[in-house]
C-alpha cells in the first residue's frame, strides 16, 4: 500500500505539471483514493479466476449484514447499494487491519 500511495502521489504531481494547475488538497485526496482503489480493483480482477460473490455472501453473512447496517444512511442518502464485490474489498481491508 505504501508503494502504491507513493507512486500515485508522484503521478498526481506529474499530472499537475502537465496540465499546469496546482490541485487543491480536496482534489488531491479524492484522486489518491479514487486511483488507489482503481488500481487495486484492476489488479484483483486480473487475478480473479471465479466470481467469489456468492461464496462470500454465504460465508460472511454477518459481515454483510454489518456493512448494510453501518452504511444504510449513506446508501439511502445517495440512492445506491454497495455491491457484494465492494463488500469483499471492505472485508479484506478490515481483515488485514
Which role does the model predict for each range below?
Residues 1-97:
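A cross-family "folded-core" feature that marks the main globular domain of proteins
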Amino acid at each position: 500500500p505504501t508503494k502504491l500511495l507513493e507512486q500515485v502521489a508522484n503521478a498526481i504531481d506529474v499530472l499537475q505539471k502537465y496540465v499546469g494547475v496546482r490541485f487543491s488538497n480536496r482534489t488531491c485526496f479524492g484522486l489518491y483514493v479514487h486511483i488507489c482503489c482503481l488500481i487495486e480493483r484492476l489488479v484483483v480482477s486480473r487475478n480473479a479466476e471465479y466470481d467469489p460473490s456468492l461464496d462470500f455472501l454465504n460465508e460472511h453473512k454477518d459481515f454483510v449484514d454489518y456493512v448494510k447496517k453501518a452504511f444504510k444512511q449513506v446508501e439511502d442518502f445517495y440512492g445506491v447499494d454497495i455491491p457484494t464485490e465492494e463488500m469483499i474489498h471492505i472485508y479484506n481491508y478490515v481483515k488485514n487491519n
